[in-house]
């Protein structure tokens, strides 16, 4: 089987490459499609093709004679100044990848969406389901989720040309070892470094990168087109999460938990002052606002059709902490 991966140099992409290699696929049959080569890909021995998801012709060439495409490319940013780049990568890039795969005769595309497209609520007692409505009313104010939601709609829709099947997987917050770039585990790192001054009032769902990667491998031959597949382990409040991290690490838990609105207002006021002083704000306004919401989700499809059974949350947190402490 010949496999191409956009965004294959990222945290999830490298884990998917490793999972395929562990299953016996030759690294030479794995081609990472990206604008630049991540140094860790050299250790895996996978092939590399220079191409951007914003270049349709380059993608068509990259997908020629490929059986399976993983579309994992994305830009994780809470900075509103990155809105244009996120639209180009998420929306235009997904459209380009789907069209290129169809034109190349690729049999299947597995697309990495997010639980944030549907799994977000102000009410912690209401846990959104993968078959429920999207969360546009809440999350569209942030460019990352707005563009991921638009991209997901493209992937869920019937493909207008060709026989390419598209499977949409929705991983929650991805934790675990190996996030050398800090793209997904920064909040845990901030806790370890004492950069979490208050406890937010929201909640999260998270999943181990190794479990998510295994599900992406299984999705090469399983999954339901036109439907979301939640990859999540557990819904926890931020308070519960930091309590677990404190027990694992000995790092003291912040005791101050002001009302959600006050946290958001304070971050909005303090962030410009920090930047004027040439410093990064401890908590930027977008992060503060997101942290007051409950990014909870539920669903059984991945368990039923992909055999997805995540490891315990404590194991994931312990391995995340162990990795981050080893590279600090």
Q: Where are the language model's segments positioned?
A:
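Flexible, glycine-rich beta-alpha linker
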Residues: 118-119, 164-185
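Active-site Tyr-X1-5-Lys
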Residues: 139-167
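Substrate-positioning beta->alpha
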Residues: 96, 183, 200-221, 227
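Conserved Rossmann-fold NAD(P)-dependent oxidoreductase catalytic core, especially the SDR/UDP-sugar
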Residues: 89-143
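NAD(P)H-binding glycine-rich loop region in Rossmannoid oxidoreductase-like domains
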Residues: 36-42, 46-92, 100
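N-terminal Rossmann NAD(P)H-binding glycine-rich loop of SDR-like oxidoreductase domains
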Residues: 3-25
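Mid/C-terminal beta-alpha module of Rossmann-like enzyme folds, strongest
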Residues: 215-282, 299, 304, 313-328
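A conserved pocket-lining segment of Rossmann-fold NAD(P)-dependent short-chain dehydrogenase/reductase
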Residues: 135-140, 189-207, 211
